[in-house]
């Protein structure tokens, strides 16, 4: 009987991808990034091994929210004090801190365990055009071709 070859962490070659988020829907961007971070686009994907690549997202402030998500989608967090429930709409978060909006969206699509946290750390989001990862020679990736 043959066994499926499982990927080992030492054998995985990681690439760096650069994604421009200008006029891209938040959901489409997040699903594509989560797929790359998990490594599901690779033939040697193994669920219990971090096989994903590094992703750099630029122009997060130019994202597009479709429908009524700018007003109706609410993000909650609590200060741990009584009555400390805070809420902010997706439109307000996009205007104030677009990096946080992308991070929350992608983090919700990754596993809720230590492997998911390890995969999340390979994502680098920037609100503007500039980023500090030129030394890694990232490969430009078009989101429209992935989905």
Curated annotation (Swiss-Prot):
Superkingdom to which the source organism belongs: Bacteria
Gene Ontology annotations for the cellular component aspect, listed alphabetically: cytosolic large ribosomal subunit
Parts of the chain that traverse the membrane: none
Alphabetic keyword roster: Ribonucleoprotein, Ribosomal protein
GO molecular function: mRNA binding; structural constituent of ribosome
Disulfide bonds listed in the record: none
GO BP, one annotated term: translation
Task performed by this protein: This protein is one of the early assembly proteins of the 50S ribosomal subunit, although it is not seen to bind rRNA by itself. It is important during the early stages of 50S assembly.
Subunit structure, interactors included: Part of the 50S ribosomal subunit.
NCBIfam families cross-referenced by the UniProt entry: rplM_bact (TIGR01066)
Assigned protein family: Belongs to the universal ribosomal protein uL13 family.
Name used for this protein in its record: Large ribosomal subunit protein uL13
Organism: Lactobacillus delbrueckii subsp. bulgaricus (strain ATCC 11842 / DSM 20081 / BCRC 10696 / JCM 1002 / NBRC 13953 / NCIMB 11778 / NCTC 12712 / WDCM 00102 / Lb 14)
Taxonomic path: Bacteria, Bacillati, Bacillota, Bacilli, Lactobacillales
């Amino acid at each position: 009987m043959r066994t499926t070859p499982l990927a080992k962490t030492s054998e995985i070659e990681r690439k760096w991808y650069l994604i421009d988020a200008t006029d891209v829907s938040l959901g489409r961007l997040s699903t594509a990034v989560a797929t790359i971070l998990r490594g599901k686009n690779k033939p040697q994907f193994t669920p219990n091994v971090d096989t994903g690549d590094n992703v750099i997202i630029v122009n997060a402030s130019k994202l597009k929210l479709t429908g009524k998500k700018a007003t109706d989608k609410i993000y909650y967090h609590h200060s741990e004090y009584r009555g400390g429930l805070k809420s902010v709409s997706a439109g307000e978060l996009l205007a104030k801190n677009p990096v946080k909006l992308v991070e929350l969206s992608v983090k919700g699509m990754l596993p809720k365990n230590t492997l998911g946290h390890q995969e999340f750390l390979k994502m680098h989001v920037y609100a503007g055009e500039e980023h500090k990862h030129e030394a890694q020679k990232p490969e430009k990736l078009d989101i429209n071709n992935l989905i």
